[in-house]
């Protein structure tokens, strides 16, 4: 498995023909963040590889996730009567979240600044973004938690899916139109979330207990913002862009079936996980919410990464992701009553570990394969020969 190649020769050929095409119409991004990023990128030395910036930003989000896992493992820390997360943690999380957002904004600028833009860089960036979705949502959940002033773990599960589908919608657009329309909600949410973390450190989580308007709690505002952004901004914009491409006869996939293929695996993942939650003999989501969310987010990231590879290489998206097969077996065992409460927890942890290892293996092998194909180092701007590239991959674990 160490040398397994996930990218087919047809896809490699498609990557050779790939040209970046994206459109950002968000006023916040255009008039505030891009000028800010243009200034920040000048701080970085020209020898620094863009992929290293991308990976560093991603690891900041992972650190935030792990930090709050330690202080708030079960999402009760913000509830009345429970030991709260220390104020300094919220400051750290807020700063690191904004730093990660900034690094995500400057990596592409660093690539253009150093004349090192490659399809691998875009795939690396968006692939890590797909995994970041679960870290964003689960980390911010700790502000409100699952107590009487928060939202239930099932509501958060549904909100997580709203975010996941909003993310994949952009790449579904590009799969069909050839243009990546950058979503408005991302920039707005990142700036808002970073600000809320800092405010929480100043006023304490108790401030979110109080109604902010007409007896509506801040948790209701949190929920309404996620759903409203998806239904009123992300979805309408995606459908409009798809319709415009249809009217101009520039759609890459003419049949409805082929256009909708990228949604099959995410919808099946949602169905299987929801059935598991509803049929669970031990109420698995109540017992292990953080692990369950992470399992869902990791499987989703793998599905999305495969879609990104296909849309960048102009190849057909696979209808079914193989990670769903073991999940199907676990859900079947739950439905027929073959999984006891203790066994069910063990199955969840095993499945999560398997998904994580499988997704990391997929990412490492794809980066390794594309690095060889484009004759580049993934984390260095030095130009290698083929022998040196192989040694570098071994040294960094690729």
Swiss-Prot record:
State the needed cofactors, names only. Answer: Mg(2+); Mn(2+)
For this protein, the record's Pfam families field holds: CDP-OH_P_transf
Note the topology in the membrane: Multi-pass membrane protein
Spans through the membrane: 47-69, 84-103, 123-145, 150-172, 179-201, 221-243, 256-278, 291-310, 319-341, 345-367
Keyword annotations for this protein?
Acetylation, Endoplasmic reticulum, Lipid biosynthesis, Lipid metabolism, Magnesium, Manganese, Membrane, Metal-binding, Phospholipid biosynthesis, Phospholipid metabolism, Selenocysteine, Transferase, Transmembrane, Transmembrane helix
Q: Show the InterPro entries listed in the entry.
A: CDP-OH_P_trans (IPR000462), CDP-OH_PTrfase_TM_dom (IPR043130), CDP_ALCOHOL_P_TRANSF_CS (IPR048254), CHOPT (IPR014472)
* Cellular-component GO terms for this entry: endoplasmic reticulum membrane
Q: What is its EC number?
A: 2.7.8.1
Location within or outside the cell: Endoplasmic reticulum membrane
Where it mainly occurs, coarsely classed, is endoplasmic reticulum
**Gene Ontology molecular-function annotations:** ethanolaminephosphotransferase activity; metal ion binding
For this chain's UniProt record, which GO biological process terms are given?
ether lipid biosynthetic process; myelination; phosphatidylethanolamine biosynthetic process
> Which pathway does this polypeptide act in?
Phospholipid metabolism; phosphatidylethanolamine biosynthesis; phosphatidylethanolamine from ethanolamine: step 3/3
Task: State what the entry records as the consequence of deleting this gene.
Answer: Embryonic lethality before uterine implantation of embryos on 6 days post coitum (dpc). Conditional deletion in the nervous system leads to motor deficits and neuropathology, including hypomyelination, elevated reactive gliosis and microcephaly. At the cellular level, deletion in the nervous system affects brain lipid composition, characterized by decreased levels of all phosphoethanolamine (PE), such as diacyl-PE, plasmanyl-PE and plasmenyl-PE.
- N-acetylalanine-modified residues are 2
Substrates-to-products reaction catalysed: CDP-ethanolamine + a 1,2-diacyl-sn-glycerol = a 1,2-diacyl-sn-glycero-3-phosphoethanolamine + CMP + H(+); 1-O-alkyl-2-acyl-sn-glycerol + CDP-ethanolamine = a 1-O-alkyl-2-acyl-sn-glycero-3-phosphoethanolamine + CMP + H(+)
Q: Which family does it belong to?
A: Belongs to the CDP-alcohol phosphatidyltransferase class-I family.
- Function statement: Ethanolaminephosphotransferase that catalyzes the transfer of phosphoethanolamine (PE) from CDP-ethanolamine to lipid acceptors, the final step in the synthesis of PE via the 'Kennedy' pathway. PE is the second most abundant phospholipid of membranes in mammals and is involved in various membrane-related cellular processes. The enzyme is critical for the synthesis of several PE species and also catalyzes the synthesis of plasmanyl-PE, a lipid required for proper myelination and neurodevelopment, from 1-alkyl-2-acylglycerol.
PANTHER family recorded for this chain? Answer: ETHANOLAMINEPHOSPHOTRANSFERASE, ETHANOLAMINEPHOSPHOTRANSFERASE 1
List the protein's name.
Ethanolaminephosphotransferase 1
The encoding gene is Selenoi
